[in-house]
Swiss-Prot record:
Encoding gene, per UniProt annotation: mnmE
Superkingdom of origin organism: Bacteria
Protein's name in the database: tRNA modification GTPase MnmE
Entry keyword Ubl conjugation: no
Molecular functions per Gene Ontology: GTP binding; GTPase activity; metal ion binding
Amino acid sequence: MKNTSSSTTLTMNDTIAAIATPLGKGAISIIKISGHNALNILKQLTQKQDFTPRYAYVCDIFSDGVLLDKALVIYFKAPYSFTGEDVCEIQCHGSPLLAQNILQACLNLGARLAKAGEFSKKAFLNHKMDLSEIEASVQLILCEDESVLNALARQLKGELKIFIEEARNNLLKLLASSEVLIDYSEEDIPSDFLKEVSFNLEKQIASFKDLLDFSNAQKQRNKGHALSIVGKPNAGKSSLLNAMLLEERALVSDIKGTTRDTIEEVIELKGHKVRLIDTAGIRESADEIERLGIEKSLKSLENCDIILGVFDLSKPLEKEDFNLMDTLNRTKKPCIVVLNKNDLAPKLELEILKSYLKIPYSILETNTLNSKACLKDLSQKISEFFPKLDTQNKLLLTSLAQTTALENAITELQNAKSHLDTLELFSYHILSAIENLNLLTRPYETSQMLDSMFSEFCLGK
């Protein structure tokens, strides 16, 4: 049978190296080396023997005696480094070929090519970062939403870890109290014990739910708000899309049915990611391809968050307009009614349109041919439908694993609250909640914490 523990230990003892900067040409590339042999490799690369930790040196870089580059190098002595091991950084000129050659020189001198995320894994296993900080560092790299940056930076600093540890300590105190009362059942349970425990549980559950609700809302925001542009043929849908993109993305033509499929683009409006979906004109059509496009248009309405219903202000309402309004009413989605072509004499019966619509809506008169003015007006209207999230001083769950662990912890605390009259069951659910919280930061043996916690309690407390 394979010894997994031994294999992991051998792998963790390896000295690893990798290029830390993205592929491509730039001002600099960074090669990182981590492990017990990192300093020795750096000495051989530079033909220099003395390095003071945390000092930057400009050194020639050699491979088999051949000069490769003049680079900036820094040595971080264990345990005062990102991984907790000896770490060396080589900041060379930003040629991909040069960086690869220096990396290959590191490998020739005994380093192993690092696996994806292995530097962070070393940091975690060497207790330099916990799971929540690892998650935050990944999401910070991937983040496209400015409003989330502060929450991720605070999580990287360790604020989520502090929040979870405080909650865990509170639950351990409750668990210790209940265990004492179980072991000494002849002692009378204090009359205010159950009331105090119930209050503390409610308070803890509420704080967890607040974190969970904010994280779920932010997750939806990160996906982007889906905005479908619908209307009858030639109402100006594609012109509207082009105006919002400030480019000719969709084909504009006087011929009905030009747009036969949905076109999707992503833009940013007032700090929010918006997925724009231009749809085929909604009408009755005998053309099979156009009909399939119309079906996709209707499907997009089911999955979108906001609808832009485009009407031609220069023409009276027609059957296709009323069919569109029937469709909008069925979706029950918030809608911005865009009255296009306001540069022409208005003929659309606005009061009839207002009375016909039964959904939340706002009205915007515009001219899609004036792209900048149209975009400015639309941005303001669309932003009114965005949910207002207060991101200041908020913590954030950044993965499905974290969300699931907290959801399970909440369920266990609710179960504990419903079993206050049976301390054995109460203790079981509190312990399960603690074990789920462990998954958010760092798993450890709860019994060790309990031993420490129990030592602070006296009989009757």
